[in-house]
Amino acid sequence: MVNAFLDDMHRPALPYKLKFKVSGCANDCMNSVQRADFATIGTWRDDIKINQDLWKAMVEDKGMDYVVDNITSRCPTSAMKVNADNSLTIDNKNCVKCMHCLNVTSPLTHKYIAKGDVEPILATGDDKGVMIIMGGKRTLKIGDLFGSVVVPFMKMETAEDLEKIEELAGEVIDFFAENALEHERTGEMIERIGLVNFLEGIGIDVDPNMINSTRTSSYVRMDDWDEEAVKWFENKAEANA
């Protein structure tokens, strides 16, 4: 990414700065969601892997109160359930990949791990890629902004995948250069012109998975929801054809 846009960064002809940040997972140690105009964050789209034997060993050792207080009750979408036999069920469709349950259980894995067993208590899925979030910034004209999900999932394994993200970054830079006001960050431009217009300008189709604030609001107008849902399913069918 740096090599592709080094000339633009060295001789910026932009209304204001444009930050790129990359984080390997949703823990986001780079603070990219809060600070980056173009954030690339590692994620996965299949199910969380559960080592039920180690999970049960942890429940037996730590107790149900610990598990509920520190893990399951802190799931932001209440997607975790401990069954009567102390096994764990995760509603993966409602999982928002926040990493909390993995963060809590990861340091405990070594305590319960069997000889030769290398699987952690909980682990990310195998179908990995990145999500792209745009518009994050600290205080300037309109205060702090978190970025909005623009690409919910993109594979990042081949040279072609890298070219796609470079092309998208180029579209964003060009659109920002042509449409942003002086001393205006990407997030402020999106707030001014609307996220739908921004997506059209960079050539990305509207997707119901693009969210502004999880579980509270979506930029997709609900009065046109049925029409937008039909478009999304048609586009998804064409992509899979």
Report each predicted region and the residues it spans.
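Small-residue-enriched alpha-helical segments and adjacent helix-cap loops
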Residues: 1-69, 74, 83, 89, ...
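General structural feature for long, well-ordered alpha-helical segments within catalytic domains
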Residues: 1-5, 67, 71, 97, ...
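Generic secondary-structure signature for well-ordered alpha-helical cores
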Residues: 10-14, 73-76, 80, 100-106, ...
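Flexible, glycine/charged-enriched surface loops at secondary-structure junctions
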Residues: 14-18, 83, 178-192, 209-220
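Short glycine/threonine-rich loop-to-helix capping motif typified by GTGT followed
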Residues: 31-35, 97-100, 190-209
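Inter-heme linker and motif-flanking segments adjacent to c-type heme-binding CXXCH motifs
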Residues: 80-86, 110-116
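A hydrophobic, small-residue-rich beta->alpha segment in the mid-to-C-terminal subdomain
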Residues: 127-128, 136-180
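Long C-terminal interaction/binding lobes of large macromolecular proteins
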Residues: 199-241
